[in-house]
Regions:
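Alpha-helical segments
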Residues: 1-221
Length: 222
């Protein structure tokens, strides 16, 4: 069974409904040339519209990222790829999402815990540190030495405006070298494999944030 099937079957087992990949060229969205993430076709539902397939969704979305053209030739970026994703539209939130991701990686794929590290939103003057995610990772045996607190890389928004929120990124140690006891943001042997975004806010053109009507989860893997 390939990775896509394992992923979809796992999340179906957790009550998610598989939705189809949207067209690469967005429909009714002129903000981008191509769909760049699995959440992009779901923006209306992340802003509060009711999705016809329910509150737990999963898929693999075809994506094109022109911003990654400068990265062609490295070992971690693709211009075209299929992003695996799962969403909660006002249903589960941070703790459940992190548990689902952790269990898929360690129990379904069999990745050793010591090969995983994470980053968590450290907070700023407007939005507090994400202590819920930090403490959840600790409870799952990720030691504090492999939990990095950052700002810019751990607050996610698709563009200048729209649904957004803190995120927690998961990294895999891909080298055959001895696994370090701590995570170094500048060590490229650690590669990001999954991002869990906790969409709590909508950013407006004037730079202000308002609470979304529902707290949503948007994850992207790949």
């Amino acid at each position: 069974m390939n990775l896509k099937d394992l992923y979809i079957d796992y999340f179906k087992g957790l009550g998610h409904v598989q939705i189809s990949s949207a067209p690469i060229v967005p429909v009714n969205d002129n903000s981008v040339l191509f769909n760049t993430a699995g959440m992009q076709p779901l923006v209306p539902y992340l802003l509060g519209k009711v999705h016809p397939d329910g509150v737990r969704l999963c898929d693999y979305q075809k994506c094109v990222r022109l911003t990654d053209l400068d990265e062609i030739g490295d070992t971690t970026h693709h211009t075209f790829f299929e992003m695996l994703g799962n969403w909660s539209l006002g249903d589960y939130f941070k703790e459940e999402s992190i548990s689902y991701s952790f269990n898929f990686l360690t129990k379904v794929l069999g990745i050793p815990v010591e090969r995983l590290a994470v980053t968590v939103f450290r907070g700023n003057d407007s939005i507090p540190r994400d202590d819920v995610s930090y403490n959840k990772w600790l409870s799952l045996s990720i030691p504090k030495e492999r939990i990095a607190l950052t700002f810019e890389d751990n607050f996610w928004i698709a563009g200048d405006t729209g649904p957004c929120g803190p995120d927690t990124e998961i990294f895999y140690f891909r080298s055959d070298d001895e696994i370090p006891s701590s995570y170094d943001l500048n060590d490229d042997r650690w590669v990001e494999i999954w991002n869990n975004v906790f969409m709590e806010y909508e950013k407006h053109a004037d730079g202000t944030f308002t609470d979304l009507p529902k707290k949503n989860v948007d994850t992207g893997m790949g």
